[in-house]
A protein has these predicted regions:
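Surface-exposed loop and membrane-interface regions of Gram-negative outer-membrane beta-barrel proteins
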Residues: 1-27, 40-51, 131-133, 165-175
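Signature for the C-terminal beta-barrel architecture of outer-membrane proteins
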Residues: 27-31, 49-207
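Small/polar (Gly/Ser/Thr/Ala-rich) solvent-exposed segments
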Residues: 34
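Solvent-exposed loop/turn segments at secondary-structure junctions
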Residues: 37-40, 80-81
């Protein structure tokens, strides 16, 4: 069933990791449908998780366009559990993907004259918050948006990211959080280099 398998399968069984078809419309436009990895920027939000035996995959439709300096992707995903003869549309994320549906737009700009790149991301996740016992389904939506910037020259490699999250989580609680990160790397020669980086997560507010 489309979207029934978990994002990371640890059961040691035989599974299909990737199976997709891509249609090239010409002039930079394409559509890609099926089970596929979604890898963007520094993989903080969407990544392949290649250190896991099975990797990370999504059953999704990806629509895209690319030219010399610009690239944009629109991603649509919908998940469901095994076939049901009764019981409604309740989705149990503990045995499948962590989200019920997803809509994502990603844009990347690559400059011509300087080694600079910038990405923008907006993701809307539909999370099941219904009642598993009664099979009543209710979907809450969580939005993540932000940017990822890079600059590289002969010695320096700089990148930074900022993401903000709002909406409702799977417990139907209001969310307002952010994450910021930055990395500066310098290569003294082919053997020696230095890297300085930091991450900041807003975390949860203390209950009073």
């Amino acid at each position: 069933v489309w979207g029934q398998d978990p994002q990371i399968d640890k059961n040691g069984r035989f599974i299909l990791n990737e199976a997709w078809a891509k249609l090239d419309f010409g002039k930079g436009f394409f559509a890609q449908l099926g089970r596929q990895t979604l890898v963007y920027d520094d993989e903080r939000i969407l990544g392949g998780l290649d250190w896991n035996v099975a990797g990370r995959y999504h059953d999704a439709l990806k629509l895209g366009y690319a030219n010399k300096n610009n690239e944009i992707h629109a991603i649509l995903a919908f998940n469901q559990n095994d076939e049901k003869t009764a019981g409604g549309t309740y989705y149990n994320s503990s045995i499948g993907q962590p989200y019920k549906n997803m809509q994502t737009v990603w844009y990347h700009y690559k400059a011509d004259k300087i080694p600079f790149g910038a990405s923008l991301l907006f993701m809307n996740l539909g999370l099941e918050t219904g009642n598993q016992l009664t099979q009543d389904s209710h979907t809450r939506y969580l939005q993540t948006m932000g940017t990822y910037l890079t600059y590289k020259n002969s010695g320096w490699n700089l990148d930074g990211a900022f993401y903000y999250q709002t909406g409702k989580n799977k417990d139907a609680e209001s969310v307002s959080a952010f994450m910021a990160s930055a990395t500066a790397a310098y290569a003294f020669n082919k053997t020696w280099g230095m890297v300085v980086s930091f991450d900041y997560l807003s975390g949860n507010e203390e209950e009073i």
